[in-house]
Amino acid sequence: MGLQAPRGTRDILPAERVYWQYLETIARQILDRAAYREICTPIFEQTPLFERGIGEATDIVSKEMYTFRDRAQRSLTLRPEGTAGVVRAYIEHGLHSQGGVQRLWYLGPMFRYERPQSGRYRQFHQLGVEVLGSADPRADAEVIAVALDILQALGLKQLTLMLNSVGDREDRSAYRQALVDYLTPYKADLDPDSQERLHRNPLRILDSKDPRTQAIVKEAPRLLDYLSARSRAHFEQVQSLLQALGIAYQINPALVRGLDYYTHTAFEFQDMSLGNEGTVCGGGRYDHLVEELGGPPTPAIGWAMGLERLILLLRDRPLPARNQPYLYMVTRGAAAERQGLILAQQLRHQGYTVDVDLSGSAFGKQVKRADRVGATVCLVIGESEATDGTVQVKWLASGEQVLVPQQELLSENWRSRFLTPHDGLLSH
């Protein structure tokens, strides 16, 4: 067997990449309107960043990180998520000293050693936002609203917003003990992962997918019942704001998310068409993470979307039609090939997409290839056209065509003509 992409990774070929480009364009437009600014951080970071930021007891840190030593024996890790790197950059570059609230977004590959399955890979891509510097419940409502705007703009129809509060540290400490006390008598009946988590990270047992564990957890104490008055007030304000924005939600007391840094609001968007793996966006508030990583006390909230899962949904839907013509240059003969190359470059400078057939194959095959790649218009320069300085313009959908001087195509009149043939100009 020859060389292949490593297990858990995949190539994104051009036919699929158009869906990624569409997704990225939609996201950029919405994030720009909401005044979020893009940030890019390294693909690998110092390992302690994730150990301290995500939590050593989490599955991500204990089981799933790609960690290695460089030639100077420094421990480095391919980023398993985006928030820790953004927070590190926020601290390192003193963004907090600029005052006000920082609205940031990122997009890029992440890495986790997981069992590959549909929509889940060891190299995967996330779109994420972080709002740093605001404890206001309006920030919680805003990031949820922005996420919903993106998902709805992509055409997702079966969305459900799951909402919970994980409280502050004191709330969780009291609840953690109550949960351990409840689960300990059932330890032998829990799935192996939950047994391991019982004293290390018991809150993660709440989102176990094992049916027997789920049945036990169903009767467990609820974290919502252990919230302080302050935590409860924050959560109630978030709910009130979501209602004011017309955003429906369901309270899910078992929703805790998989990272240790979350406080107060935790949420997920699920798309039911993806079944049990239906989470397409998840996030929450992390009011202590900046301080824990060496920065000043800074409340913050954010979310991340798994793009592979969104692409699974997008590929079942037609993309919006192109509003720009896709021109395909077909030539025969040395003079025509030269003129075709020059004309194509001139048209590209005018803003058109122009594909030049470089195969040297027969005329008919070149025209068939134009149709196969999705071109809207075929530009044909044969030997006679090369002699006359003309070009045949052929609309592939209708088969209509017209002979015009090559330089006429550079006029503004042709911007609309390329999209729709004009009666009176056509020869058949």
UniProtKB/Swiss-Prot annotation:
InterPro entries: aa-tRNA-synth_II, aa-tRNA-synth_II/BPL/LPL, Anticodon-bd, Anticodon-bd_dom_sf, His-tRNA-ligase, HisRS-like_core, HisRS/HisZ, HisRS_anticodon
Enzyme Commission number: 6.1.1.21
Single GO molecular function: histidine-tRNA ligase activity
Coiled coil: none
A GO cellular component annotation in the UniProt record: cytoplasm
GO terms of biological process kind: histidyl-tRNA aminoacylation
Organism whose genome encodes this protein: Thermosynechococcus vestitus (strain NIES-2133 / IAM M-273 / BP-1)
Main location, first listed in the record: cytoplasm
Protein origin, superkingdom: Bacteria
Disulphide bridges: none
Record note on quaternary structure: Homodimer.
Lineage: Bacteria, Bacillati, Cyanobacteriota, Cyanophyceae, Acaryochloridales
Protein name: Histidine--tRNA ligase
Substrates-to-products reaction catalysed: tRNA(His) + L-histidine + ATP = L-histidyl-tRNA(His) + AMP + diphosphate + H(+)
Pfam family, one: tRNA-synt_His
Keywords: Aminoacyl-tRNA synthetase, ATP-binding, Cytoplasm, Ligase, Nucleotide-binding, Protein biosynthesis
Signal peptide: none
Record localization: Cytoplasm
Protein family: Belongs to the class-II aminoacyl-tRNA synthetase family.
Cross-referenced NCBIfam families: hisS
PROSITE patterns from the UniProt entry: AA_TRNA_LIGASE_II
